[in-house]
C-alpha cells in the first residue's frame, strides 16, 4: 500500500509546496488520488529554466516557450480563486508582457502575501498593493521595458529584512509612471528616471535625496508625512540645521523639489508646503509650471507661499483646496492674515490667470482672503469658488452672492474678469466685471 498517498490532503499540499510547480504537476500521473492535488498548493514556483535548455534549437525553444506559457495558464485556471500565499516567478527570456501581467494580477487578486521576482525582461506595467516583495540574493529585478511602477503599502525585503530605514534607489530609463505610497521612514531615496512623466510620492521625509533625475516630468504630487514634533522643531526660531538631525532631514527635501523643477502640473499637500518653508532660500524656479494645486489645513502654515509664487514665472492656474491655514508672520505677503504695508507684494509678480477656491465655507476670513487675491493678482481673469459640500456653510448661498457682487463693484478689473460660484460641482451664478 502507498503510505504517502494515504496521508491527509493538507499534509500532501504541504509536501508539494517544497517542489517547483512543474515538479508538483508531475505527481498528477501517479494515480487518480494525485491528479489535481498540485492545484491546491498555496505556493507557486514558476521557473522557466526547468523548461528551457541552452542546447535547444531556436525553433524548439520557441515551441517550448509557448508550451511553458500554456502550462502556467492552465495551472492558474485549475486553481481558480483558491487563496495563494507565495508566487515565485523566475523568467530568464522574453515573454508576452500581457501574459506575465495577467499571472501577477491573478496572484494579487487571490491575496498573495509574498512575491518573489527574478529578471523579467518584457514587463511594461507592474502594480503591487499591500504585498511583501522579496529581492532575491541571486540578483536584482531587471525591468528594462518597464513604463509604469505603482507601489502601494509594499514591504520591500532583502534577506527577510524590512526596508524601513534602508536606502531605496529607483533607476529606470524607460519608466513613465512612478507611485510610491507607504508610511515608513526611508533612509535615502534616489530616483533616476529620465523618461518619467508622472510622479506621486506619499512618504515620510527621507534622510536624504542623493539623486533626483526627472527632467521630463509632466505631473508631480508630493504628500509628505510628518509628525507634529517635526513641524514644531521646523518652526522654532534660531534653528541650528547642522546640530538638529530632524530639521536637517526636512531641509534635504529641497533636493527632491529641485529634481522636479521641470514639472508642468504640481500638487503639494499641507505638510509639504509647511516643510518647504525651510527651503525658501534654495527654492528652484519652476519655469514650466502651468498649474499649481495647494491643499491647506488650519494647522499647517503658508510660509513658503510667497517665494513659491514668485518662482513660478509662467503659472496660469492656481488651485487652493481650502484657504484657512496656520497664521505666522512669514506668510503675510501671500495672504492678509497679518496686516502689513507690503501685503500682497508677492502676488503682484505672479501671472496667474485662473484662481480656483475649493472647500469654501463662507467664513468672514475666507471672504477677506478672496478679496485679497482678486485685488493683488494683476493678470487674474477668472475666479471659481466651490462651496464646501461636506458640512453646512457658515453663510447661506444668497449671502455669499451678496459678498461677491459687492466685491465686483469695489475691485475694478478688466471687463473680461469673471467670478463663478459653484455648488455641488454645478454653476450657481456667474458675475462679470462691468
From Swiss-Prot:
Keywords of the record: Leucine-rich repeat, Repeat
LRR repeats: 125-153, 157-182, 265-296, 297-322
Xref: SUPFAM superfamilies: F-box domain, RNI-like
Repeat listed as a keyword: yes
Keyword Repeat: yes
Gene3D superfamilies for the chain: 1.20.1280.50, Ribonuclease Inhibitor
Designated name of the protein: Putative F-box/LRR-repeat protein At4g13960
Species name: Arabidopsis thaliana (Mouse-ear cress)
Residue stretches making up the F-box domain: 1-47
